């Protein structure tokens, strides 16, 4: 069941694509999207890409194609859209796909976990658990994954920005509800180069100081004939990463490419993506939070830096567990985020008889990987944890590392801080995250006496597999930012109650929640229609989308424990006396079908060629997926209530756009009402989530370009409240967790001849760590700085420092999000500390 459906999709689409050239013969009109791509590539090829993108940072005359039926300028549209070119992305210091989004107003991207698994929100829509539930990542207009918040498999994990990316278009607000399924909040479209003109780049990046990374990027493309062109590029890298974990945690790379054949009236394109990459997983770490709930003081612990410390260690790289089939599985912790993608896709556009235009896109991806990272479930004194595990009189010894086997006579002096952590190893195998998507549309333009009319009819189909195997274990570990060791516990009777640092198979302190497996499939079908009318200076547009989801499959957890000799040494150690195993005989079904009608209607009025007003009303939906499993969201027969399976988001927005020769300003007021059903496995007080939210605010995005000086800036004011909570009514009226009132960014730069210097400032005001609104997370400002020197027209060198001032910026608090603890101990995740790297680039 896992691959046959995807293969059937591949065959059907391949046959369709094979028929397209014959149908396209003798057509003679150019398509709007190809025109936009061509214009952009030509600009980038003349005088270098950086110079092309130096043009106005918020260019309201730029044509955009994302979540819109036709290519249209920002000034002429009624949608909120931002665009980042490749040079802007490089100068911002963005390391991953989610990092790029921090520079966009209205977007809150918590990318503190490394190059994947980011938490992403837009305009106050909640991040109740993890991922980006109400947004969609796209690659050339097609979803990377159907859902943005799949546990341990978020779309940014399967997308690696590199030299292939020409620009990123970000559409915020309800217009995306009509042009994409499961994206009522925003669409992030990563658009690749298509080889309009001959050329490319090669770049080398080398980390400095504690930043251990080496990376080679390249891309090249150009015409093959007058009507055929290509582009190919990718990267390879290795190193420990942003934190010194003591082993190679970054390794692998990516290769992407496409070939385009222009025909009369359109084009045919085939593309591919190959990704096999490993990145370290950065989860919360131990730290000190003292002071008051309203004004806490956040500091590193002795021997453990909040910014650069990690629980990963060269002394702990192997985990033994039982998988869903009951077989032994050995995991290499160095795999971290292991992401594998083998994808092919295609796009075609041409005219039919009667002035109708056909646009066809498909993507078929075989996705798989794993997620492995240490999570500090509890931090306390080593003596207290020894007693918690082994009872009164329990003693400690080193389980591995340079002191393996030695007794710890003075736990209060352990690692210079006297602390230890009960660590839960998040260990998830992702054998099948395959998806197949297809989007077919027909469009036509009409000239009427009152103005031009554009009409689009389309049909979207996708199949998303989600197959996961969770096998978490519990360990005891020293609190050291580098080279930490596992600990053993011996009870007062002299009996070892741990084994090589292993406290338990599974996570008994969390009720063994996280020994589970599931094999589910979600099929989306969505016919849609949109139209626009431009009478004079007005532009009216609207659309309808009818989404249907069909869910099938099964899921199973553990039921009780068994005595199993997991390590096959012939001895039953204490952890082997209570081993949780997935009970496949008690697997529960998933079997339901749900529908929802979505709409979006907008208007834009050009007061002058440089000033416009716009407004929009939308109702979108997010169809829930694996987050309903295990949380009580499904009935025993596999069905789900409509309000649980489908979460509706109603949005209203309006604003003004203004542009002059040197400046641009985009101001948008917004209002959103959101339903949310979810689960959070790391929360032991609010595991189930059933809430409604209301958020309102204002977005500001502007730019100033004057001579050698350029600046892009933005800010978002958000007033968000929980308006209903079926699980915890006491939270009604509170601010959602981690939602700041203000989020802001600014990117100034100045060119001194061949030298360009600049910075990116990313900031947030304070927010609450949890929905009860007890403990505050302080606001912070992160500063990234760069300097680039053009040696000649082809060669440049640059120096980049991310988080220049090594700021602590908390994005979540985990162990005690409600209040400062008496001992000041807690766990939290911060933005990465200072990383400095040098780059060399040569234009081919």
Predicted features, each with a name:
Residues 97-100, 120-123, 135-138, 155-158, ...:
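N-terminal periplasmic accessory domains that precede
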């Amino acid at each position: 069941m896992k691959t046959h459906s995807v293969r059937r999709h591949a065959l059907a689409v391949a046959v369709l694509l094979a028929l397209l050239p014959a149908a396209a013969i003798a057509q003679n009109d150019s398509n709007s999207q190809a025109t936009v791509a061509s214009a952009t590539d030509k600009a980038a090829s003349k005088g270098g890409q950086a110079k092309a993108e130096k043009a106005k940072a918020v260019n309201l005359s730029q044509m955009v194609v994302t979540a819109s039926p036709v290519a249209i300028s920002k000034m002429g549209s009624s949608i909120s859209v931002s665009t980042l070119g490749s040079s802007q992305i490089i100068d911002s210091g963005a390391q991953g796909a989610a990092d790029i989004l921090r520079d966009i107003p209205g977007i809150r991207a918590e990318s503190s976990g490394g190059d994947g698994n980011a938490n992403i929100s837009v305009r106050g829509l909640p991040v109740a658990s993890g991922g980006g539930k109400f947004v969609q990542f796209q690659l050339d207009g097609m979803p990377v994954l159907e859902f943005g918040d799949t546990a341990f498999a978020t779309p940014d994990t399967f997308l690696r920005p590199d030299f292939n990316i020409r620009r990123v278009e970000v559409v915020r607000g309800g217009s995306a509800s009509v042009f994409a399924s499961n994206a009522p909040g925003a669409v992030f479209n990563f658009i690749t180069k298509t080889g309009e003109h001959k050329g490319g780049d090669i770049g080398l990046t080398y980390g400095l100081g504690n930043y251990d990374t080496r990376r080679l990027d390249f891309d090249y493309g150009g015409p093959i004939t007058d009507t055929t062109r290509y582009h190919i590029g990718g990267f390879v890298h290795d190193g420990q990463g942003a934190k010194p974990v003591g082993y190679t945690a970054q390794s692998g790379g990516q290769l992407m490419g496409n070939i385009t054949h222009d025909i009369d009236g359109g084009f045919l394109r085939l593309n591919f993506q190959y990704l096999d990459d490993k990145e370290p997983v950065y989860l919360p770490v131990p730290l000190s939070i003292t002071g008051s709930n309203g004004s806490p003081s956040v500091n590193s612990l002795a021997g453990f830096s909040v910014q650069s410390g990690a629980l990963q260690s060269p002394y702990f790289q192997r985990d033994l567990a039982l998988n869903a089939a009951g077989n032994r599985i050995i995991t290499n912790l160095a795999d971290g985020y292991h992401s594998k993608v083998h994808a092919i896709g295609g796009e075609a556009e041409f005219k039919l008889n009667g002035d109708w235009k056909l646009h066809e896109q498909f993507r078929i991806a075989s996705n798989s990987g794993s997620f492995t990272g240490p999570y500090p479930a509890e931090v306390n004194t080593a003596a207290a944890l020894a007693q918690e595990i082994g009872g009164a009189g329990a003693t400690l010894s080193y389980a591995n590392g340079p002191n393996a086997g030695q007794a710890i006579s003075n736990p209060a002096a352990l690692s210079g801080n006297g602390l230890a952590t009960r660590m839960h190893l998040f260990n998830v195998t992702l054998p099948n995250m395959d998806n197949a998507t297809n989007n077919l549309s027909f469009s036509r333009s009409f000239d009427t006496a009152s103005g031009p009319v554009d009409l689009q009819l389309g049909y979207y189909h996708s199949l998303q597999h989600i197959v996961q195997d969770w096998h978490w274990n519990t360990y005891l570990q020293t609190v050291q930012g580098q080279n930490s060791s596992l600990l053993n516990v011996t009870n007062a009777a002299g009996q070892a109650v741990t084994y090589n640092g292993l406290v338990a198979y599974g996570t008994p302190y969390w009720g063994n929640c996280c020994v589970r497996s599931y094999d589910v499939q979600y099929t989306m079908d969505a016919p849609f229609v949109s139209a626009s009318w431009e009478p004079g200076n007005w532009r009216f547009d609207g659309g309808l989308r009818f989404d249907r989801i069909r869910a099938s499959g099964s899921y199973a957890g553990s039921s009780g424990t068994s005595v199993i000799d997991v390590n096959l040494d012939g001895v039953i150690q204490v952890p082997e006396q209570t081993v949780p195993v997935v009970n496949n005989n008690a697997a529960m079904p998933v079997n339901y079908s749900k529908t929802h009608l979505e709409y979006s209607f907008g208007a834009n009025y050009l007061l002058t060629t440089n000033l416009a007003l716009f407004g929009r009303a939308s109702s979108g939906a997010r169809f829930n997926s694996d987050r309903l499993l295990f949380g009580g969201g499904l009935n025993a027969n596999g069905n789900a209530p409509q309000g649980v399976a489908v979460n509706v988001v109603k949005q209203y927005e309006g604003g003004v756009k203004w542009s002059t020769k040197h400046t641009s300003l985009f101001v948008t007021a917004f209002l959103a009402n959101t339903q949310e059903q979810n689960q959070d496995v790391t929360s032991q007080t609010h595991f189930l989530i059933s809430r409604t939210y209301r958020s309102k605010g204002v977005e500001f995005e502007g730019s100033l370009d004057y001579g050698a000086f350029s600046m892009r800036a933005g800010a978002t004011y958000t007033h968000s409240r929980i308006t209903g909570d079926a699980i915890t009514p006491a939270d009604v009226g509170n601010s959602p967790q981690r939602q700041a009132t203000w989020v802001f960014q600014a990117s100034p730069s100045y060119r001194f001849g061949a030298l360009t210097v600049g910075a990116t400032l990313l900031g947030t005001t304070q927010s609450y760590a949890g929905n009860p609104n007890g403990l505050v997370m302080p606001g912070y400002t992160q500063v990234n700085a760069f300097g680039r020197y053009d040696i000649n027209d082809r060669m440049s060198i640059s120096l980049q420092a991310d988080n220049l001032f090594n700021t602590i910026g908390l994005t979540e608090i985990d162990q005690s999000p409600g209040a400062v603890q008496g001992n000041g101990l807690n766990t939290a995740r911060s933005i990465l500390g200072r990383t400095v790297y040098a780059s060399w680039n040569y234009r081919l």
